[in-house]
């Protein structure tokens, strides 16, 4: 009986050992089996009790080895939201010149290079856009994140102080970028009204703007060339511009020479009046009536040709009796300060085009002869790639018939015949009936499906 009991205990120990369960369960299982075994002698129980008493260090009743599942349950129960420690961001510092962030070690290398770059770019700007050199904010005596944040805020404000507002839209830019922006920034038509100097509320608004933001100095228009200059630059520019105007005016033909432009009187309302003399110097073209500067008119007349008209139109003026009489002035007035007033509206004649009989597109009279051989060669290549049932016969060029006694082609009839020839190559789709070029019909038929009758 004792041997059987020992075998049973040894098998229990092996099974618990292989299952990797807590070790204290083995003793409980053994004790549980001993408590229910009525046939074991009392001496054996006493001996086991002595073994437990004699070896108290080997058995650790206070420690428990937990499995992975039980440990997760206990941790989730005791700590439902474990604390998350964020990774500490390194202390970045803001450059007081450009406003970008750099590491504490990199900032000492960056600032001298950034200041040198700032000086180079500032020296390239016009004088009225140049800014004073930015000053580095004083270091803060405190320590910790508060002093770092205050230093970065002061550096950022120093970099933002260099921005200049656009006079048109009010947005702020760096001085070198403001010039680029002003090329494309145009004032809105329905913008706010311009403040007049007579109203007290407008004067108060101007004082607020001038006290808050440093605006770009106003520009004045040159009465000779019409360009804008600063108030200090204009007195230097005007004598040079007038000298240049005299040289160019002397080179012109006599009928195009203009009188010396007179400087307008200074007015409080200022700038719009300066453009008056510049507009008065413009000369109109006798062919198209457009106005140009005198030196630009000969350049324009090289390409501007009078519109061909059939019968010569006589210059008719109203007589005293209400009838029409022919003008007695044989010479056309070429030196006109304003365009002539005519009852007929200006008609811009489109250059004549010819339709290609192969592709149906329009080309100029010179380009069509270059295009047609290339288009026909391309047509042959594409036609050979088609299936045999979709190949078309070669398109024929329509006959060109000249009108008797005039010697030029009837372009309308020629284009109509070429368009008909190009349209005859289209093939209808057998499903929807739409017409396509043969190479496009194959692509269309992949997605064309018959409509399902309702």
Curated annotation (Swiss-Prot):
Disulfide bond residue pairs: none
Binding positions for Zn(2+) 4 per the UniProt entry: 285, 288, 300, 304
Region span, Disordered: 48-85, 125-146, 256-282, 299-345
Residues binding Zn(2+) 2: 166, 169, 181, 185
Binding site residues for Zn(2+) 1: 95, 98, 110, 114
Keyword Metal-binding (UniProt): yes
Compositionally biased spans, kind Polar residues: 66-79
One Pfam family recorded for the sequence: zf-C2HC_2
Binding site for Zn(2+) 6: 429, 432, 444, 448
Keywords annotated in UniProt: Metal-binding, Repeat, Zinc, Zinc-finger
Zinc fingers classed as C2HC/C3H-type: ranges: 91-120, 162-191, 218-247, 281-310, 352-381, 425-454
Superkingdom of this protein's organism: Eukaryota
InterPro entries: ZC2HC1A/B-like (IPR026319), Znf_C2HC_C3H (IPR049899)
Transmembrane segments: none
Needed co-factor(s): Zn(2+)
Annotated GO MF terms: zinc ion binding
Protein residues bound to Zn(2+) 5: 356, 359, 371, 375
Binding-site residues for Zn(2+) 3, renumbered to this chain: 222, 225, 237, 241
Protein name: Zinc finger protein 474
Source organism of the structure: Bos taurus (Bovine)
Taxonomic lineage of the native organism: Eukaryota, Metazoa, Chordata, Craniata, Vertebrata
């Amino acid at each position: 009986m004792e041997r059987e009991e020992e075998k049973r205990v040894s098998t229990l120990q092996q099974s618990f050992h292989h299952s990797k369960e807590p070790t204290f369960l083995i003793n409980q299982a053994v004790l549980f089996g001993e408590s229910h075994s009525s046939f074991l002698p009392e001496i054996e129980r006493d001996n086991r009790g002595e073994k437990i008493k004699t070896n108290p260090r080997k058995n650790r009743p206070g420690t428990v080895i937990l499995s992975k599942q039980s440990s997760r349950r206990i941790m989730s129960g005791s700590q439902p939201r474990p604390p998350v420690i964020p990774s500490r961001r390194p202390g970045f510092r803001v450059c007081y010149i450009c406003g970008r962030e750099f590491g504490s070690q990199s900032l000492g290398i960056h600032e001298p290079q950034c200041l040198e770059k700032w000086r180079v770019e500032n020296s390239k700007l016009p004088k009225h856009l140049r800014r004073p050199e930015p000053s580095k904010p004083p270091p803060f005596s405190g320590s910790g994140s508060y002093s770092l944040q205050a230093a970065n805020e002061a550096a950022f404000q120093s970099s933002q102080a260099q921005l200049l507002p656009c006079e048109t839209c009010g947005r702020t830019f760096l001085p070198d970028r403001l010039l680029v922006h002003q090329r494309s920034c145009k004032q809105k038509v329905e913008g706010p009204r311009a403040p007049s100097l007579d109203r007290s509320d407008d004067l108060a608004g101007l004082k607020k703007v001038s006290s808050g933001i440093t605006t770009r100095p106003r520009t004045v228009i040159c009465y000779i060339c019409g360009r804008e200059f600063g108030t200090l630059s204009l007195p230097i520019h005007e004598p040079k511009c007038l000298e240049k105007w005299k040289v160019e005016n002397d080179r012109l033909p006599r009928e195009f020479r203009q009188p010396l432009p007179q400087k307008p009187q200074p007015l409080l309302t200022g700038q719009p009046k300066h453009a008056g003399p510049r507009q008065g110097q413009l000369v109109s073209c006798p062919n198209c009536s457009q106005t140009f500067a005198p030196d630009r008119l000969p350049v324009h007349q090289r390409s501007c040709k009078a519109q061909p008209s059939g019968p010569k139109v006589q210059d008719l003026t109203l007589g005293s009796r209400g009838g029409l009489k022919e003008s007695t002035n044989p010479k056309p007035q070429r030196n006109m300060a304003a365009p002539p007033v005519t009852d007929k509206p200006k008609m811009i004649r489109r250059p004549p085009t010819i339709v290609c009989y192969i592709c149906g597109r329009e080309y100029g009279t010179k380009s069509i002869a270059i295009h047609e051989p290339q288009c026909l060669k391309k047509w042959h290549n594409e036609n050979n790639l088609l299936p045999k049932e979709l190949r078309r016969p070669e398109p024929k060029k329509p006959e060109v018939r000249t009108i008797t006694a005039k010697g030029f082609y009837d372009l309308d009839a020629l284009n109509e015949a070429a368009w008909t020839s190009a349209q005859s190559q289209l093939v209808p789709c057998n499903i929807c009936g739409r017409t396509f070029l043969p190479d496009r019909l194959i692509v269309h038929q992949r997605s064309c499906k018959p409509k399902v009758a309702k």
